[in-house]
Amino acid sequence: MRRSEPLDLLLLHAPSVYDFRKMSIFYGPISDMIPSSTVFEMYPLGFLTIASYLQKQGMRVRIVNLAVRMMKDWSFSVPRFLASQHPRAIGIDLHWLPHAHGALEVAKIAKEIHPGVPVIMGGLSSTYFHQELIGYPQVDYVLRGDSTEAPLVQLLLALRNGGALDKIPNLTWKQSGLPRINPLTYLPPSLDYADLRSDLMVEMVLRYRDLGSVVPFDGWMWNPITAVFTVKGCAYECATCGSSHTTCSHLTQRTQPVFRSPESLVANIVAISRLIRGPIFLVGDLLQAGMDYAESVLQRLRETTVENQVVFEFFDLPPVAFLRRIDSSVRHWSMEISPESHDYEVRMAQEGESVYDNEQLEQIICEALRLRCTRLDVFFMIGLPQQTYQSVQDTVAYCEHLFAISDRRLSCFISPMGPFLDPGSRVFEEPEKFGYRVFARSLEDHRRLLVQPSWERILSYETEWMTRAELVDATYDAAESLNQSKLKYGRISTRRGQAVANRIRAARDIRTRLAANQNQEVDAGSALEGEIEKFSASTICDKRELFWSRHLVNFKVREILGILYRFYSKGLSEKSV
């Protein structure tokens, strides 16, 4: 490709709140259980599958993580940057609902600077709110569903060549200012059509001389977590999940999960391992597709030389025999499981299909730790149906019990569900049935909540069993107790544990002072600006607990040199903008 060739698609990832550099919002722990910060700067994996698929079609794509650029350089101007770009189309993700503010603001700026350039939005939240979204003047198109790569190609070609739009599947668009909704009919029966290509990220860095725009989240270079999709859709019915079977049936029209073939899945794992030494997450439970499928994946992994940590996610308890098969097939492996609560009744109130008691959970934990499992993370949630304040504290006591019967490879985490209920989830659609009171129904409702002064007021729900204030109390009390248990059983160092304890105390103090000045929100927030920023990260745990041990060198130099050679031999380098 030559420098003069136009950019077919500029993919932009916005911060959660566009004005985060100017506003003092006390986010608390809402991002403590994910790799990114309260800016929610991690772009969806779909950016990489889109870029990979479009490149195969001869199209040119650039990913720009505006959130990271804005975080790393406070003088970075989004309008000035966008004015320097000349794409044929602009794509903006609204996948996770916490981007409701930033995504719309970036779209507005893009449309003001490039009024003739179409703005396309996509993602699960875009899919749910597509009719409301298309009503915003800055949004021209919304692509619905969980696999929009092929419809996106059709749309870009139609826009370039003047083709008809009414035949493009999954598209919501405007005609003479009025919304048009094409049927959501594109549902690929396999996920083999697009890879998560880490080498494509390197090529973008080389082409634009711009590392900051491509990194998935701030700190990724030090902790290069990677992932591959194993499935889209789900067989389970968890009431709080925005990707449950019922939700997918209505939202993306998937009435059953679709899986990536074992051959394609393992080939993608191997390709990632050639470049990156970090852990590789298998997104989704392999056992959803059946034991034969899962065994086939393990057999192919056994035949590879992958040295990365391979992280297995389980929605239900895996059979002991399957854990042993993992142990004999994968050199380095870890596992994650999310019982959500220690309380069987609370767990059952989710109305999912995984039914196990604590004794069975403990048997699997002990078996995994008897094997070569490097790390075992157990996740619990606050804000569930039928969950009381006392139940949350009892869950933390159960975590201490798990520490007592295990070793340092096991860790437990607990966090509030939020800041929003998942749109399309059963609790979102039937809040009264599950005991919820919701404070946001529309996209605009959620956008407005995001700029409230504290996470207590950002929360989009409360339950029959806990108000928003009680959810916050339960969170800080649980975090404090869990931190003490981690110190007691050596899960974290004294230094880190003390730092977490100090942050929890400071967060409580900030909450009290904000509440005392709730009628003077702006002044109170401005007065606490430095403290709010400092104590809105690693509040309820040290975020470093989420990451695996670092390597001295996280990337494989030989593979990078190979990419460099192939890249420059084709004359693809361009001057950075």
Where are these regions (language model features)?
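Radical SAM enzyme core and accessory elements
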Residues: 1-7, 11, 60, 82-85, ...
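N-terminal [4Fe-4S]-dependent radical SAM core
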Residues: 2-5, 21-24, 174-230
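Conserved SAM/AdoMet-binding glycine-rich loop
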Residues: 3-12, 120, 261-375, 382, ...
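Short glycine-rich His-centered loop
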Residues: 7-39
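Flexible glycine/acidic-rich beta-alpha junction loops that bind and position SAM and/or redox cofactors
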Residues: 19-20, 129-130, 236, 248-249, ...
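Glycine-rich beta-alpha loop elements in corrinoid/cobalamin-binding modules
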Residues: 53-57, 62-190, 424
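Catalytic cores of alpha/beta
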Residues: 130-137, 386-401
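Canonical Radical SAM [4Fe-4S] cluster-binding loop centered on the CxxxCxxC motif
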Residues: 218-261
